[in-house]
UniProtKB/Swiss-Prot annotation:
Residues 1-44 are annotated as: Disordered. GO terms for cellular component: membrane. The chain crosses the membrane at residues 52-72, 125-145, 151-171, 184-204, 226-246, 290-310, 350-370, 381-401, 442-462, 479-499. Belongs to the CTL (choline transporter-like) family. This is CTL-like protein DDB_G0288717. It comes from Dictyostelium discoideum.
Amino acid sequence: MWAPEEDYKQPLLTNSRVANNGNNNNSNGRGGSSSPSTRLQPEHSSRKCNDILFTILFLLVIGGMAAISGIAYTKGDPSRLVPNAPNIPSIPGFNTNTTSSENPIEQYFVSHLESLVAELKRDKDILIYSVLLAIALGAAWIQLLKSFTRFFIYFTLCVGVALVATLGGLFMALGHKEGSESTMIVGGCIIICTLVLVVVIVYLRKSIDLTCAMFTETCRGVQRSPSVFVIASLVVLFFIGFIAYWTSSFIYLFSIPGSTVNPLNDHTSSEANSTDSEQEQSAFNTKIRNLMYFMIFGFFWASSFISAVFQHCVAGVVSNWYFSRDPTGKSLVGQENAYRSLGRALSTSFGSLAFGSLLIAFIEFMAFMLRVCKNSNATNKLVVMVVSCLQCILGCIESIVRWINKFGYIYVAMHGHSFCTSTKECFDLISRNMFNAVIMDFIGGLVLLLGKILGSAASALFTTALLYGMGKSLNPITIALSAIFAFCIFNLFTHIVGIGTDTIFVCYLEDLETNKDGNLYISPDLHELLQDKCNECKEKEQKNQSKV
């Protein structure tokens, strides 16, 4: 995808710097002493299968989902879910024999939807062109991000702020023209958000240089292994296939004859004088509900595991590239780097990834059960308030666990340790080097988000111009789908860059502890910026302690 880069030939650290810092190294610590011609790599344990218990549990859950799917496909009847089907039971108080022709509103929406779908079929070629354009823009975006990092990041920030300000101005003008106060209020809120965004960017201007260097280093590592994009695409396609399988299984399970009551609604109750058949029906519905809960939990675990495999692959690619460079900056890693990382994720690190994803799945399942409880007790305001508070707390816990898992997966990819060991050692590494505050200063997330928005807007504009130039009607569904596809494609690119940036950060800390600030693997510009940032954090800490 990319030609070999000339910027790899630059030396990572000058000999004078190595000579000055080489005397400060001693035999204490993990790396020992290092000479200008010798660079030590972090200690790697022999890779072996870890967290085997969670591997077995995950495979059992997948096997259980397959067994339930077999039962659902055998006994399910999705035609029962179609309105006005002859075998669907009638609901008291509703006339199920009413046709759509007797309802003019329904007839209007159905006919309008049919026309939109027909236009969408006619515009399928334009959708294909927009997807190809989004892929090309994503590849160009990464190349620009590496070659013109500072300019491109500032350009992205300025364009993003300008777009938000323009949107606010349009809402204000539209509200003034139509005399709508609500529209003007929305425009005012958007303009206020724009001002807040400008203040945040000005406050974090010192971190922009650090972000530029981090992104440059990440793009170098990613471009040395373009196969990571192939692996990422395969993971996404596998996830889409899994969603299709799970959705069809769930529909068939929901449509098993006898499950006339919504299994996800706990309102079901029986009369005191119910017959034996009604009791059997209630018991059958309980079984269906429990199977559905199992399928939902399995979906959360499997989807979290797929995401963990993706993060492991990217982290393995970037970390392997980081520690495989020679003193001139060249690396011997190639196309097989990503495939080896995927192989480790599906073999020795399988249990560790299953363990980390299980934590996320359990939290997501608890959040789902809280939503079911909230819907079942919608009339009880006290229960709704308590459940809403629990949902807020659980959401905060989920964000923290996801943040912890991210670094745990990176360390698993680097060393092959178990999940708990990797997470503990990674955060010990961060705390020992006083860099935990640096992560919060990065504005990379904002840049990546604006990049996704710009990519989606460019694809939508391209589709609109193409439809207009070909004399076709501007189908809103076609334009919206092109923007959605572009957002998903850019999300894939930016997700790779985001994980790679976090991996570079952890690799630098490991590099610094191993080589003791002498003859490091990292490029000199990023090393200087990180050292300056570390000194700033230490100065702030000393000032705070002196005030206390």
